[in-house]
Regions:
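Transmembrane helix-loop junctions in multipass membrane proteins, especially transporters and channels
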Residues: 84, 88, 129-133, 162-167
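Alpha-helical bilayer-embedded segments of polytopic membrane proteins, i.e.
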Residues: 18, 69-81, 105-157
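Membrane-embedded catalytic scaffold of the fatty acid hydroxylase/desaturase
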Residues: 1-105
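Juxtamembrane/interface segments at transmembrane-helix termini
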Residues: 1-5, 28-32, 91-92, 137-141, ...
């Protein structure tokens, strides 16, 4: 939790939804799975970030991995695009997230997922196309650039927060 007050945590979670993420899937993926199974192969899905990334010494070493130090940061810039368009829907459709069984999700959470995504898409994609007096490709480019900067920034922050020895 960010705040001692559950009221403020709830407000923040709705803001989280408005930037394209889903607080319910985040809670499962991060709080329940990642913090329970930190860096445990087969459970911590953060170790499965991309096929060209070797995040664990237990993964087979492939030739592409010699380039991961070059490919990682540019690829992490794309992470929020994957998150807002694919990841939350995929996680809600799975019967397991990491080591946690999630056979069904409350209807309320499905509604919140779709409403949150609809608000995000409307605010950050649809409305700029309608109201910004610029070519459509400028609006699209601005959206993609903002998502790339957000993904890159989040990657750097989370990488620095998670670099630990022998875990």
């Amino acid at each position: 939790s960010l705040f001692a007050s559950s009221k403020w945590n709830k407000v923040f979670s709705w803001l989280f939804n408005l930037v394209g993420a889903n607080d319910y899937t985040w809670s499962i993926m991060h709080n329940k799975v990642h913090h329970t199974y930190t860096n445990i192969e087969g459970h911590d899905e953060d170790l499965e970030s991309a096929p060209f990334m070797r995040m664990s010494p237990h993964k087979p070493l492939k030739p592409i991995h010699r380039w991961q130090h070059i490919l990682a940061l540019p690829a992490y810039g794309l992470a929020t695009l994957s998150w807002v368009f694919v990841k939350d829907f995929k996680k809600m459709s799975q019967d397991h997230i990491g080591g946690i069984a999630t056979p069904s999700h409350p209807r309320k959470e499905w509604v919140r997922l779709f409403v949150g995504k609809a608000l995000f898409y409307t605010i950050f994609i649809v409305l700029p196309f309608i109201f910004v007096q610029a070519p459509w490709y400028h609006c699209l480019g601005a959206f993609l650039l903002s998502q790339y900067i957000e993904g890159f920034t989040l990657a750097v922050v989370f990488m620095l927060a998670h670099v630990v020895e022998e875990t």
